[in-house]
Curated annotation (Swiss-Prot):
The keyword Cell division does not apply. Belongs to the pyridoxamine 5'-phosphate oxidase family. Its cofactor is FMN. Substrate binds at residues 58, 115, 119, 123, 183-185. Homodimer. The gene is pdxH. PROSITE patterns: PYRIDOX_OXIDASE. This is Pyridoxine/pyridoxamine 5'-phosphate oxidase. Its EC number is 1.4.3.5. It comes from Allorhizobium ampelinum (strain ATCC BAA-846 / DSM 112012 / S4). FMN binds at residues 53-58, 68-69, 75, 97, 132-133, 177, 187. NCBIfam families: pdxH, PRK05679.1. Pathway: Cofactor metabolism; pyridoxal 5'-phosphate salvage; pyridoxal 5'-phosphate from pyridoxamine 5'-phosphate: step 1/1; Cofactor metabolism; pyridoxal 5'-phosphate salvage; pyridoxal 5'-phosphate from pyridoxine 5'-phosphate: step 1/1. Signal peptide: none annotated.
Length: 206
């Protein structure tokens, strides 16, 4: 996609954020080298100190943006404590960015179970073996845990650990950014006062 194609077309005419996000994500899937669903996830600890890391978006709809993790990890404990988070998608191939922030809820057990069973066997075993975000004495200790859980679940299905599930970020703001010449970028932000309220669209200075 050429620079001219990237910066033509007025996406700022859109009046609803989820449809626009779906369009941009679809285009990113065609242009990004890998992981077009990779997103920076920001959380804060009890002192207000932020943490950020990359996760993979696994689902989204009008209700929000879903990813899965170990609830005993740093991000898991911070989200369960604060009930808020932010995300930032950056697609370099498209020169586009989407930022969002909002309230967070835990997905249903049915949703988590369904997604968990789609994961490779090694990933399901890893969810049991890894005490995510806690000190690890050696690589051997991790590999030993993997071997132990592999043997335990050699026959039959691998159940989802109680500490492993998904979060849904229900955005209160979603901002779309597109690169422009001379740093004169295009930015629009969709805002709502509360969940369930209508969106208000604001064009922003770059």
């Amino acid at each position: 996609m050429s620079q001219n194609e990237l910066t033509t077309g007025d996406f700022t005419d859109e009046h609803e954020p989820f449809g626009l996000f779906e369009t941009w994500l679809t285009e990113a899937k065609a242009s990004e080298i890998n992981d077009p669903n990779a997103v920076a996830l920001a959380t804060v600890d009890e002192s207000g100190l932020p943490n950020v890391r990359m996760v993979l978006l696994k689902d989204f709809d009008q209700n929000g943006f879903v990813f899965y993790t170990n609830f005993e990890s740093q991000k898991g404990t911070e989200i369960l404590s604060q009930k808020k988070a932010a995300m930032c998608f950056h697609w370099k191939s498209l020169r586009r960015q989407v930022r969002l922030r909002g309230e967070v809820e835990v997905v249903s057990d049915a949703e988590a179970d369904a997604y968990y069973q789609t994961r490779p066997i090694g990933s399901r075993i890893g969810a049991w073996a890894s005490k995510q975000s806690r000190p690890l004495e050696s690589r051997f200790a991790l590999e030993k845990a993997v071997a132990e859980y592999t043997a335990r679940y050699a026959l039959g299905s691998i159940p989802r650990p109680a500490h492993w599930s998904g979060f849904r970020i229900k955005p209160l703001t979603i901002e779309f950014w597109r690169d422009g010449k001379f740093r004169l970028h295009d930015r629009i932000e969709f805002r709502r006062e509360a969940l369930g309220q209508p969106w208000n669209k604001v064009r922003m200075y770059p």
